[in-house]
């Protein structure tokens, strides 16, 4: 009996390390789940309101396009070209330039240099306003530009008239984008969401009034866009300057006029990076495919693109916050969580586009020909949505880390040396038309670009990046500290 008891005791002792390993594994698993949940909450505090805000602001253009589509095919084509080509180009550039604030404000907020957020925003206003002036010729000469690229005279002339009416919205971008980044970086995202909701509701009512009540036609639809965007700017500006952001808005500062060249260079890199990203979602027409059909697909893609771009903003802020606080590992963890969640959402929307391909065209047009053309492009649209669910998030990592210039070169290389040549071969050599051009740019340019960015972020020394962020925050805040 004694021997058996000793043997049993020996077996129990042998099991103890195994039991400890199981307990430790369970504890680690539970800790990982808690970390994922905590990071998800932090991310969605930014991404949730950002999605609502971006969808609301972009919906202003989509609703305008829908109203114009029911006025006639010429009106739909003209307003679509203005929204997707003229405004889209300038919006992408200015939106990207404003994302420089995600680097600077995000890292300053993480380092508790709160007063610098207001100074950075004022610098951004100045830089974006000056760039807005430089971009004005695109609006004044929209008709000859569109004719040069092969648009019919009637569409080009009407587009040129609408473009002039879009100038107030163009200048609203220069103030709205810095304001929204200012709030995002200090986690006041509900303010932007409420402001955007008010502007969207007002837009729907005023658009109906101008088009059906006052019979102002397609010019009336563009006038409502101006009113809605400036209403948004007014709400955000008033909230910030009336004492609701005491730590980050300390009034107008002469510091806003210092170091503008450094700020402009970072902003230009950001703008170029995001503009190329938006261009790569597809922007070429084919005479065999109705302009209306492609514009509808671009509007749907652009609307869904607001979700990855919200993750772009959220990832930029989260990575910048953690790097500014010196937490390199947490910055990497935030990046992984953001990429995975954006990819899941992209898969869901891709499936929805394929499933609803017979219905989505009716929102924008009553023409059977246009709706059938949209149906033919729906599979490619679904793949575009899926591929674009990852790349913007990785670009957000670049913004949070301050790599804008480097990533802009990657974007340029992939777009001009891979995407466009492949699109040319598929579109003209293999006679696939616009679908071939579109597929070449997306599958060639975006896919290669995404793989390169994945390689870069996976090999990144995050602790070294955290040190760089600390140096950057000190550099940009030294002048204010001396004051």
Enumerate the predicted regions with their spans.
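Interhelical loop/hinge segments that connect adjacent transmembrane helices in multipass membrane
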Residues: 2-47, 218, 222-228, 234-274, ...
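Interfacial segments at transmembrane-helix termini and the short loops linking adjacent helices
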Residues: 37, 146-166, 283-294, 356-382, ...
């Amino acid at each position: 009996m004694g021997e058996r008891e000793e043997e049993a005791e020996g077996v129990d002792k042998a099991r103890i390390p195994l039991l400890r390993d199981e307990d430790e594994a369970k504890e680690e698993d539970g800790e990982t789940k808690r970390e994922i949940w905590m990071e998800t909450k932090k991310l969605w505090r930014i991404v949730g309101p950002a999605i609502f805000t971006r969808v609301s602001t972009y919906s202003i253009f989509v609703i305008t396009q829908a109203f114009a589509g029911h006025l006639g095919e010429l009106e739909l084509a003209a307003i679509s070209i203005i929204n997707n080509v003229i405004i889209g180009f300038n919006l992408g550039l200015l939106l990207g330039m404003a994302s420089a604030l995600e680097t600077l404000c995000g890292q300053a907020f993480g380092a508790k240099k709160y007063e610098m957020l207001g100074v950075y925003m004022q610098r951004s206003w100045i830089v974006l306003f000056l760039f807005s002036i430089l971009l004005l010729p695109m609006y004044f000469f929209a008709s000859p530009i569109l004719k040069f690229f092969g648009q019919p005279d009637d569409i080009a002339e009407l587009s040129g008239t609408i473009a002039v009416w879009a100038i107030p919205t163009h200048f609203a971008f220069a103030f709205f984008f810095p304001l929204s980044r200012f709030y995002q970086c200090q986690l006041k995202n509900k303010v932007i969401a409420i402001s955007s909701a008010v502007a969207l509701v007002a837009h729907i009512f005023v658009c109906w009034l101008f088009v059906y009540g006052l019979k102002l036609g397609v010019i009336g639809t563009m006038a409502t866009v101006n009113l809605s965007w400036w209403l948004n700017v007014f709400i955000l500006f008033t909230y910030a300057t009336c004492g609701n952001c005491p730590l980050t808005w300390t009034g107008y500062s002469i510091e806003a006029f210092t170091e503008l060249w450094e700020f402009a260079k970072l902003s230009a890199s950001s703008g170029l990076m995001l503009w190329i990203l938006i261009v790569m979602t597809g922007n070429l027409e084919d005479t065999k495919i109705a302009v209306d059909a492609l514009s509808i697909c671009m509007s749907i893609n652009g609307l869904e693109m607001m979700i990855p771009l919200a993750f772009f903003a959220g990832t930029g802020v989260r990575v910048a916050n953690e790097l500014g606080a010196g937490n390199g590992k947490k910055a990497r963890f935030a990046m992984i969580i953001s990429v995975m969640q954006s990819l899941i959402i992209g898969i869901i929307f891709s499936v929805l586009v394929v499933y609803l391909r017979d219905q989505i065209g009716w929102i924008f047009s009553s023409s059977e020909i246009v709706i059938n053309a949209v149906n033919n492009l729906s599979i490619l649209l679904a793949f575009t949505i899926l591929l674009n669910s990852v790349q913007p998030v990785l670009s957000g990592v670049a913004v949070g880390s301050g790599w804008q210039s480097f990533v802009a070169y990657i974007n340029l290389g992939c777009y001009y040396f891979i995407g466009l040549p492949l699109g040319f071969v598929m579109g003209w050599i293999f006679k696939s038309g616009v679908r071939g051009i579109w597929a070449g740019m997306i599958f060639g340019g975006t896919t290669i670009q995404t793989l390169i960015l994945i390689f870069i972020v996976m090999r990144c020394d995050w602790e070294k990046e955290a040190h760089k962020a600390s140096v950057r925050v000190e550099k940009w805040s030294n002048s204010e500290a001396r004051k």
